[in-house]
């Protein structure tokens, strides 16, 4: 439970940020996704092509 706790918080913040900053949606989503993925499972690293 503790492991997914951080992931959930990150996902929530990501949704709120997406609604607020819809213009920088791709750039923000990339960084937030990387952070959430690192928190949940540090072994998996998603590739961010559009930075």
Swiss-Prot record:
Gene Ontology molecular function terms on file: DNA binding
Cellular localization per UniProt: Nucleus; Chromosome
DNA-binding recorded as keyword: yes
Biased segments, Low complexity type: 1-13
Tissue: Testis.
PROSITE patterns per UniProt: PROTAMINE_P1
Record keywords: Chromosome, Developmental protein, Differentiation, Disulfide bond, DNA condensation, DNA-binding, Nucleosome core, Nucleus, Phosphoprotein, Spermatogenesis
Domain of life (superkingdom): Eukaryota
Record region (Disordered): 1-30
Mod. after translation: Phosphorylated by SRPK1.
Disulphide-bridged cysteine pairs: 40-48
InterPro entries, A to Z: Protamine_P1 (IPR000221)
GO biological process: chromosome condensation; chromosome organization; sperm DNA condensation; spermatogenesis
Annotated TM spans: none
Chain intervals with Basic residues compositional bias: 14-30
Any one of the GO CC terms: nucleosome
Family from the record: Belongs to the protamine P1 family.
Subunit structure: Cross-linked by interchain disulfide bonds around the DNA-helix.
Role of this protein: Protamines substitute for histones in the chromatin of sperm during the haploid phase of spermatogenesis. They compact sperm DNA into a highly condensed, stable and inactive complex.
Name of protein: Sperm protamine P1
Organism in which the protein naturally occurs: Homo sapiens (Human)
């Amino acid at each position: 439970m503790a492991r997914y706790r951080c992931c959930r918080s990150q996902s929530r913040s990501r949704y709120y940020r997406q609604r607020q900053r819809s213009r920088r949606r791709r750039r923000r989503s990339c960084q937030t996704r990387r952070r959430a993925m690192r928190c949940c499972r540090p072994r998996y690293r998603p590739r961010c092509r559009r930075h």
